[in-house]
Amino acid sequence: MIFRSVSNTDFRARVRTLLLAGSTALAFVAAPVWAFSIDDVASKAKDLAGDKYSAPTSNLPSEFSEMKFADYQQIRFINERAYWGKLKTPFKLSFYHQGMHFDTPVKINEVTATTVKPIKYDRTKFDFGSLKFDENATKDLGYAGFRVLYPINKADKQDEIATFLGASYFRVVGKGQVYGLSARGLAIDTALPSGEEFPRFREFWIERPKAQDKQLVIYALLDSPRATGAYRFVLRPGKDAVMDVQARVFLRDKVSKLGLAPLTSMYLFGSNQPSEQHNFRPELHDSSGLQIHAGNGEWLWRPLNNPKHLSVSTFSVENPKGFGLLQRGREFSRYEDLDDRYDLRPSAWIEPKGDWGKGTVELVEIPTPDETNDNIVAFWNPETQPEVGKPLDFAYRLHWTMDEDELHDPKSSWVKQTMRSVGDVKQKNLIRQQDGSTALVVDFEGPALKDLAPDAPVTTQVSTDSNAEVVENSLRYNPVLKGWRLTLRIKVKDPKKPVEMRAALVDEAQKPLSETWSYQLPADE
């Protein structure tokens, strides 16, 4: 039996009614008489969608809203005072203080077997360092967001494994991982001239876990000028962190582009787009490419770029089996960064549940001068949008992993790396001379290639758009990888326009031996 959104008084009254009904009636009440579910949140989301949008208001004193980042960093949550700290559950909660642009509180509630109660702001849970402020001004401030703590790396140490902070952003890590890319609840009109709308999680409900629980359940209410939504997250920590997401979205008004299961990452430079300035780090990115597993079984890999101009790429898919932003290549020598450890940043893989129908996986690449800006976005854009006020239900599993080999077709092969340089031709005197072309070197490896003889009849299928001429298409065995290396040299006709290319390895019967390499050479490069 489910009673939604009941107060403690209502709950006690209903229990009292059941008791008065006698022992016969009680015999039928074996399960708890109250439970919280996504339907409770969806009811709130539907009601919100029927009302005019009300923008959140800030209650933050100026000494916090105007502070610099260095000052905000001084505000430290005291983990010894974590929520559920005295309970035997392995999960604990800590909270983000408001400050800078995190200037609007979110409501956070605890759900138990019998009640829902707000988790109230407590200033004594924070160490403010050398900051000076009026303590009375923070009395009813509220939290900006929260973290989930769990002993993921050591049994006696609580590590931060998930964070919900800002708009509808959240990040998760598994064992041995460090924070990298983010996920979001919903994206609206991303990269459109009209401007992007950022929905916001305005309220959370977190189920108090039992001592033996290995998962944490979080509910969230999303709100924005043109959409509302109810979300249920089930977080399972481990070597890979797995999060099951269930959502019900309502539109207040029509949108031009609806982004489901959005991911946000950063790409500054890498082997397929080397840094224009000398840098001891060969690569600097949270993710190296977009991977798609289409409904027809095709696997596609798209290396990321940091373009000079905004770039939007669309990949038409029906009933996608998966897509995500991956960090392929875990060797420390690729990054050489002891501080930020890009080699330990997870990939995020979206595994849709059920059929999502027709639509596109969209990749947005935004120019950025440094690594402080998230400039990569990927999401699913359904071909058919829900009617205003009607629910859109969807669900997916989100994997946060460093084991990218598990995200391939185990019988095929995939791109190990893409390298770009100026093209050249070896002269009779053995000196290489540049010829005005751009060279792309693509290494393929995997089970489909590993056991083939070096002289096996492996060939390529290569295509480009009309803005490029292919002047070299050569394939050779790579004994280091026990795979094959494809070298392409192209001459760009109009440098002000990008070039789209695709390539795959096939056998003598033209049967695919690899995923499809889909590459865009950005404009003005």
Swiss-Prot record:
Single annotated GO MF: catalytic activity
Signal peptide per UniProt: 1-35
One GO BP annotation of this record: beta-glucan biosynthetic process
Gene3D superfamilies: 2.70.98.10, Immunoglobulins
Keyword Ribonucleoprotein tagged: no
Keywords: Periplasm, Signal
Cited InterPro entries: Gal_mutarotase_sf_dom, GH-type_carb-bd, Glucan_biosyn_MdoG/MdoD, Glucan_biosyn_MdoG_C, Ig-like_fold, Ig_E-set, MdoG_OpgG
Family as reported in the entry's similarity comment: Belongs to the OpgD/OpgG family.
Protein name from the UniProt record: Glucans biosynthesis protein G
Species: Pseudomonas aeruginosa (strain ATCC 15692 / DSM 22644 / CIP 104116 / JCM 14847 / LMG 12228 / 1C / PRS 101 / PAO1)
Gene that this sequence comes from: opgG
